[in-house]
Amino acid sequence: MTTIETLKWDGKKSGEVKLDLTVAKETSSADLIHRAVLRQLANKRQGTASTLTRSEVRGGGRKPYKQKGTGRARQGSIRTPLRPGGGIIFGPKPRSYNLDMNRKERRLALRTALMSRISDVKAVEDFGSTLKQPKTSDIINGLTRLGIQKTEKVLVILDSPSEVIKKSINNIEKVKLIAADQLNVFDILNANKLVIGQSAINKIKEVYAS
């Protein structure tokens, strides 16, 4: 059972919250997380890159020069890959880069990644509670009160963030907001600090406990 110190939005300590998630064995955790990240990045690829082979390039019915008598190597088409304007040999074609990983492994990888970052977690009882209207500077000042540097990449995890909070965070380059039930391994590992709302911790327990 891991205990996380909770803070108020003004940076003062308010108590503790417990988070206990089942993780992968130490011997297999690195491989599991690696495969989960590879899958996530691969599945983001569009796979729409496409080139033309010699048979697909427009033209090419004409021989560039006669078969014999020139002293040069014979060529049958002006669209051979050996000539400018010719086709591409083994070029990319549209394809799917999607990788499979079963749901049980995906959940285990996510829990393992999250628990491995527990020392970088800031649990906040009332994130953005003073915000009445979208204001980027209030979020930046609030993160500073929580002990987070402006140069650090921050992942903010909330249960059901308001539109005011969404708009306030949207304009901050190094801060990303994500819902507690939409976590992913890459964002968890990519951030320097994780700021989690107390209600989001309860949501994480509910959604990812098993």
Swiss-Prot record:
This is Large ribosomal subunit protein uL4. Residues 60-71 have a biased composition (Basic residues). One of the primary rRNA binding proteins, this protein initially binds near the 5'-end of the 23S rRNA. It is important during the early stages of 50S assembly. It makes multiple contacts with different domains of the 23S rRNA in the assembled 50S subunit and ribosome. Belongs to the universal ribosomal protein uL4 family. The keyword Membrane does not apply. The gene is rplD. Keywords: Ribonucleoprotein, Ribosomal protein, RNA-binding, rRNA-binding. GO terms for molecular function: rRNA binding; structural constituent of ribosome. One of its GO terms (cellular component) is ribosome. InterPro entries: Ribosomal_uL4, Ribosomal_uL4-like, Ribosomal_uL4_dom_sf. NCBIfam families: rplD_bact. It comes from Prochlorococcus marinus (strain MIT 9312). One of its GO terms (biological process) is translation. Part of the 50S ribosomal subunit. Residues 46-89 are annotated as: Disordered.
